[in-house]
């Protein structure tokens, strides 16, 4: 790891708990995703939640649009370990029902639940059962009067919408909540979060909504969330992709890993390759990413195909290889080793060295 580590001053916020996961304050930034199965298909939803948990999801959100879905949620909750957020709109009775079934957080907009007595019923229930709430403002569903006032979604419009909902909870003396102000436009989302970060002390849930497919969505999310996280804004995040939800978790951790905020698993440093490469760098990286998905312990591994940049990268990596003629140089903790790797068997040799280092360094294979 490079000795140059700029300090990111985290925004001060109150701490809440989603199940056993702390959000805000000095807690690690939590990574979450959302199921895209039919919630009433209990078997498929449970399977997807467990797959998300295996790749590191701290929290999983589940849409609960109907009472049938609420009954399914009860069965789902009993079969998984990761905290679950119920995504609820319009019908306050669904929120009350999933609260009975042990939901860990309610994602609602107080403004679309209906009359204040209904909002109060949800808040009172959340308070009694110690369930936090996420206020989720979205540029695509901004209130009609704010659309008319501002002409279009603007940072000020999203802020005003969020503060309206915050005011409702404040009036009901409820402070166990987090807030999001999502937009599909990067600059709109970033500026909205900046304004909100100055206006309230509650934890912020980050996201670029409807970001797009796997590649474009990951790029948009990395740009937008990267700007905010580098400024110390954000306490939990979701990468919204039109892709397998597992990719949302992987991209989320990749963003945090890139900013040295939170690491999970192997951070591969690999060259884009050119005619100087002495072994198949791309194939090596792809194979190792698949083989080492079970590794949680953070580790920097450099895989460079030649001696131009290879030694320099290896010096600041936990483990590294530098391409050579038929055999490649091997570095451990920044020091060149006498042992060399056979280029034809580099994947197997490198995997063995990585697993051996994990076993020595972190036998329990933990995340930080």
From Swiss-Prot:
Binds 1 [4Fe-4S] cluster. Pathway: Isoprenoid biosynthesis; isopentenyl diphosphate biosynthesis via DXP pathway; isopentenyl diphosphate from 1-deoxy-D-xylulose 5-phosphate: step 5/6. Its EC number is 1.17.7.3. It catalyses: (2E)-4-hydroxy-3-methylbut-2-enyl diphosphate + oxidized [flavodoxin] + H2O + 2 H(+) = 2-C-methyl-D-erythritol 2,4-cyclic diphosphate + reduced [flavodoxin]. It holds the Pfam family GcpE. Gene3D superfamilies: Dihydropteroate synthase-like, Sulfite Reductase Hemoprotein, domain 1. Keywords: 4Fe-4S, Iron, Iron-sulfur, Isoprene biosynthesis, Metal-binding, Oxidoreductase. GO terms for molecular function: 4 iron, 4 sulfur cluster binding; 4-hydroxy-3-methylbut-2-en-1-yl diphosphate synthase activity (ferredoxin); 4-hydroxy-3-methylbut-2-enyl-diphosphate synthase activity (flavodoxin); iron ion binding. Its cofactor is [4Fe-4S] cluster. It comes from the Bacteria. GO terms for biological process: isopentenyl diphosphate biosynthetic process, methylerythritol 4-phosphate pathway; terpenoid biosynthetic process. [4Fe-4S] cluster binds at residues 271, 274, 306, 313. HAMAP family: IspG. Converts 2C-methyl-D-erythritol 2,4-cyclodiphosphate (ME-2,4cPP) into 1-hydroxy-2-methyl-2-(E)-butenyl 4-diphosphate. Belongs to the IspG family. This is 4-hydroxy-3-methylbut-2-en-1-yl diphosphate synthase (flavodoxin).
